[in-house]
């Protein structure tokens, strides 16, 4: 078993770490950074950019630059959250088998495929850093991710060529990273406010056991939402001043997004910042510029309800854990958005305790995941994680009621069964609708899947005994089975979530990812060959223009023809690496005569050296 890497696949940024030499270490990417932007871009030349390179070109290529893909991971297209995401994101969200996907230049990609490209970049960078192949990983997800979102995350890892040993909750991972498993028995609260999600988890630690008592949160609340408040404010102010609706312009919207994110970061240390976006748009009267001062007080008023929503979640989770605020020993702050001063102030004020900020909030989750990797590999001894299911699981029963089989807060892995019966006389089959959520009516909860149990023996209603079993593994992924206890007939469904991906589709995506990897490498070679050719053509043309007088006409024409041929090849987008190299080689050979002419000219211009021993004088 090789090294297992821990990956925090974030909404805004991702990070990775490895456990070696009895300690967890953050792995820097090829750019030397400890975090990688969770951004994928498709260029007009067919390149796929990931991370910093994708982020740098976002303003000029907004419709083909994919960020915050985690926000639609595992979402059904008709869900309200999908509609909200569609309004906010510049790229096109489409319906694929009922699930959210995106469309780029007429091609449809699932969130799993986009996430896989981020994971492939992390995998390759980890291999470069470690000097060995990486095939296994522990990937973290928000504690409040439902079954569909967890399954989709695991599928992304598979497509990227990773064997995902475990999906673990981010707050639990953070608790491991802080070394809380080594402390005396304490009640710990982890407050995790990331780029797109919010989790709050209460854990009990002690004797090398980390046990989750309760968890809650919002899979659609994070730093992006703080940015969006600033974007809305700036757009409204701009419209009031100019009458122009700037949010309809995707390029302007991307510039607004970057400016809002930067302003948010600056206001963590400054009381005021200026947003200056020249030439943001134009109308009949000419170009328009956006210049606006934003104070920390204004930013706090724009985002106050978001912060209060997190405080409300804290209250609920502490109550679910059967505790009071006073029983919380320590508060651990995780996620980049916890740097916002008002967030720290409100959490500290509510719990009435100093906050633990001893580890980088952007890296702590990946570090914890690597420790869990060490546990699974056997390098870390005597650490036990007892996580819980964030939402109740059950089935739809007579009258459209949600009947719970596994309650939220149940320690996983878990397996529970309940016996149900038929609703009508001589009913030959039952449909099992699997649900996740806390609402009393089935329609108000999330449907995870449906299957039928056929061949029930004729009997009056209420007589057949149908045993339904829910089995959740350590990743929080669910399998449901139903058995007619009279006939022994059974049916099982492994919940694939709303990702809509079959095993064969995932396998195809794995192969496609490998294929693209080779294609990308070939495209990079062509680009490098084109760049080299362009540089040579430019330099040779410049030298030819300067030294043409020192060449005979035939040689000069031969060199010019070789330059023109190379330039034509460079302009041809379909030119292969071999064609570019052949034309480059031809120019190098033709230009040898130019080099000789330049050398001869230099020699001719060298001043004749006088012999110091010779005296110019008459001799008698």
Curated annotation (Swiss-Prot):
Ranges for region Disordered: 597-620
Organism lineage: Bacteria, Pseudomonadati, Campylobacterota, Epsilonproteobacteria, Campylobacterales
Function: Acts as a chaperone.
Gene encoding the protein: dnaK
Gene3D superfamilies: 1.20.1270.10, 3.30.420.40, Actin, Chain A, domain 4 (3.90.640.10), Substrate Binding Domain Of DNAk, Chain A, domain 1 (2.60.34.10)
UniProt xrefs under CDD domains: ASKHA_NBD_HSP70_DnaK-like
Residues annotated with Phosphothreonine modification: 197
Protein name from the UniProt record: Chaperone protein DnaK
Family from the record: Belongs to the heat shock protein 70 family.
Keywords, ordered alphabetically: ATP-binding, Chaperone, Nucleotide-binding, Phosphoprotein, Stress response
The species this protein was found in: Helicobacter acinonychis (strain Sheeba)
């Amino acid at each position: 078993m090789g090294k297992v890497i821990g990956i925090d696949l974030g909404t805004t940024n991702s990070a990775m770490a490895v456990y070696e030499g009895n300690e967890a270490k953050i792995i820097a990417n090829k750019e030397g950074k400890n975090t990688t932007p969770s951004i994928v871009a498709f260029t007009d030349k067919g390149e796929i950019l990931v991370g910093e390179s994708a982020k740098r070109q976002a303003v000029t290529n907004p419709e083909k630059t994919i960020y915050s893909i985690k926000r639609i991971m595992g979402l059904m297209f008709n869900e309200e959250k999908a509609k909200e995401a569609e309004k906010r994101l510049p790229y096109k969200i489409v319906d694929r088998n009922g699930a959210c996907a995106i469309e780029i230049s007429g091609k449809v990609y699932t969130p799993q495929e986009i996430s896989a490209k981020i994971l492939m970049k992390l995998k390759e960078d980890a291999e470069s850093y470690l000097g060995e192949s990486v095939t296994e990983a522990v990937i973290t997800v928000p504690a409040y991710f439902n079954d569909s979102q967890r399954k989709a995350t695991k599928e992304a890892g598979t497509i990227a060529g990773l064997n995902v040993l475990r999906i673990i909750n981010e707050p639990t991972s953070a608790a491991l990273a802080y070394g809380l498993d080594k402390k005396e028995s304490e009640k710990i609260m982890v407050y995790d406010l990331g780029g797109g999600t919010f989790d709050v988890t209460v854990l009990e630690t002690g004797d090398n056991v980390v046990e989750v008592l309760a968890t809650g949160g919002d899979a659609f609340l994070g730093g992006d939402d703080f940015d969006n408040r600033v974007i809305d404010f700036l757009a409204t102010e701009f419209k009031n001043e100019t009458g122009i609706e700037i949010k309809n312009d995707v390029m302007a919207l991307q510039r607004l997004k970057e400016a809002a994110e930067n302003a948010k970061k600056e206001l963590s240390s400054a009381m005021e910042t200026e947003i200056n976006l020249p030439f943001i748009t134009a109308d009949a009267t000419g170009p328009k510029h956006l210049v606006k001062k934003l104070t920390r007080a204004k930013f706090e008023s724009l985002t106050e309800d978001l912060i209060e929503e997190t405080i409300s979640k804290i209250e609920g989770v502490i109550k679910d854990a059967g505790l009071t605020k006073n029983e919380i020993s320590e508060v651990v702050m995780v996620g980049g958005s916890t740097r916002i001063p008002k967030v720290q102030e409100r959490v500290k004020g509510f719990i009435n305790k100093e906050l633990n900020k001893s580890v980088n909030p952007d890296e702590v989750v990946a570090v914890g995941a690597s420790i869990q990797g060490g546990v699974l590999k056997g390098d870390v001894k005597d650490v036990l994680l007892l996580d819980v299911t964030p939402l109740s699981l059950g089935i739809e029963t007579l009258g459209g009621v949600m009947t719970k089989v596994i309650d939220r807060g149940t320690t996983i892995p878990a397996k529970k069964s309940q016996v149900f019966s038929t609703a009508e006389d001589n009913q030959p089959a039952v449909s099992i609708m699997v649900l996740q959520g806390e609402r009393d009516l089935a329609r108000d909860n999330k449907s995870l899947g449906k299957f039928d149990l056929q061949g029930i023996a004729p009997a009056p209603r209420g007589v057949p005994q149908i045993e339904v079993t829910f089995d959740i593994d350590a990743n929080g992924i669910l399998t449901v089975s139903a058995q007619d206890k009279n006939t022994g007939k059974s049916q099982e469904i492994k919940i694939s979530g709303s990702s809509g991906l079959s095993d064969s589709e995932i396998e195809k995506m794995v192969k496609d990812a490998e294929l693209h990897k080779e294609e990308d490498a070939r495209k990079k070679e062509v680009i490098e060959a084109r760049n080299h050719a362009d540089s040579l053509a430019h330099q040779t043309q410049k030298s030819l223009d300067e030294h043409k007088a020192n060449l005979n006409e035939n040689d000069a024409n031969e060199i010019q023809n070789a330059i023109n041929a190379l330039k034509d090849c460079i302009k041809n987008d379909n030119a292969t690496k071999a064609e570019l190299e052949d034309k480059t080689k031809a120019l190098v050979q033709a230009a040898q005569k130019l080099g000789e002419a330049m050398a001869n000219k230099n020699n001719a211009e060298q001043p004749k050296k006088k012999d110091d021993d010779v005296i110019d004088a008459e001799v008698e």
